[in-house]
Amino acid sequence: MAKKVLFINQEITPYVPETLLSTMGLNLPQKVQEAGLEIRTFMPKWGNINERRGQLHEVIRLSGMNLIIDDTDHTLIIKVASIPQSRIQVYFIDNDDYFTHRQMTVDEHGAEYEDNGERAIFFARGVLETVKKLRWTPDIIHCQGWMSAVIPFYLKTAYREEPTFAHAKVVTSLFSEQPKSDFGKKFKSSVVYKEAKSKFMKGYNDKFDYLELGKLAIDYSDGVIEANRGVAPELLAHASNKKVPLLNFPGDDFMDAYAAFYEKIYPTTEE
């Protein structure tokens, strides 16, 4: 039986401008699907996405849940579209406060949003709640981009008893792109949810910046990939020190190396 891979991407072209992250957000799921694996793909519904041009539409049966972050209700809206020239369907996580009326991770003046940490938390919980509703059980969950970095932590704590994710292995791709600002003093308390308890956050700095977020992702991942050159050496060293399986940058022709890494993390069993 073909492996099932859930891709949780920060960016995917053509919905947002071409960057290393958005290109990888398209190319990796496409190559994995072409290799015969079953996939699902998620990204935030950034405010700069043209819904009409991208032919996004809301999925009513998946929308409407309220996610509470810092004692405030935020409504989860799910939209979906298909990437032209491919059979890839993309699910978008949307919310009026966090995404619809914003740009991406920075505003129109280039300033990073102060609540980017909360946005990452909402995105993580939104994805996981939606996958549960889809009744689709992934074997591998591959997180690309720091906006998805909370997901490994939640999978191994708050969602560890969920049948949907019980047997899944988590892979985190580290990129050189990183925010300059930290995620605010409240991040460590905001991320607490169900079994994702505050005691698990005690070992991380109160000034929760990109490196701390990266360490959090690594600590709860089953494998880590160096997705391009220039990844923070502190994070690669952290993965090595924690003895988390690490795939060093395999070059631009990456698919064979990624497929072998998937097999290492989640070996195929004979039916």
Regions found by a protein language model. Give the residues of each.
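Catalytic cores of nucleotide-sugar-dependent glycosyltransferases that transfer UDP/GDP/TDP-activated
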Residues: 1-271
